[in-house]
Amino acid sequence: MRVLVLFVAAIIGVVPYLETRDPHAASEAETAAARIPLENYINAHATGNPEYIRKAFFPEAKIMAFRDGKLLNLSVEEFASRFSGKPAADESQRKRRIDSLNITGNAGVARIVLDYPETTLTDYMSLLKVDGEWKIINKVFYGEPKAKPSSAAAQLPDDREAVKQAVLDYVEALYEADSARIQRSVHQELFKLGFERDKEGTYKPYRMTYQELYDLAGRWNKTGRIPKNSKKEIVVYDVADQTASAKLTARWGIDYLHLAKFDGKWMITDILWQTPPRS
């Protein structure tokens, strides 16, 4: 009797699995095979080689989109003719990915995203296994232009360099005992808070005004006890059109800096620093 009860329980435990399992679910091998035409399609865009398009698509496939109020309907050969045989000039900035792939039996659908500098293209592919080989039967797509950067954003590389230069002026002002570089890189309403560790290992905070920093720069390394080429590692974290943040690792420790643009010039407004952290 005990054996019968266990047997019945085992059957009951299996039944839900049998009921919910999709008998047509694709195996890993089948999924990998269905990815091949999708990868050929991506390779066509990456290399500009039209032969990848011919490998990816069924010969009678259609490529369609609704653009400028009209239906665009291309044959495979018409679509392949758009590939020049070489990568795009901005290929290094282009990204592509297979977002999803769903297969049932010998049919499937996939979504591919082409993320380009000026536009994002979304492809929806219908796939079919024909004579034992997966092919793209149909493609519909939508392209969405990206917002053009503002004039301020367009200056970002220059701004980033200007932010880095302001931090460099600050650290080299101290290394080279040159107060003038504090004057050109630090705002006079500076807020500076430091944490210095004493001999007992306790951090003690203290504040410094702009004038105190200016005076310190003139005397801190006046005797040249610290080499002018001492550590000055600068990492610019973020630059917006008006504000920025950066990190400085120097001889005295670590500084986290906020900067703002005044009359077109980047100036340090806040500094939070500490002596070298405990190892």
Residue positions per predicted region:
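Sec-dependent signal peptide recognition
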Residues: R2-F7, L127
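A mature extracytoplasmic/lumenal domain signature
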Residues: F57-P59, R67-D68, L114-Y116, M125-D131, ...
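Surface-exposed, charged secondary-structure patches
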Residues: K62-R67, L72-T120, F191, E196, ...
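Tryptophan-centered short beta-strand motifs
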Residues: L71-N73, W134-I136, T202-R207, W266-T269
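Short beta-strand edge/turn micro-motifs at domain boundaries
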Residues: V109, T120-K148, S245, I254-S279
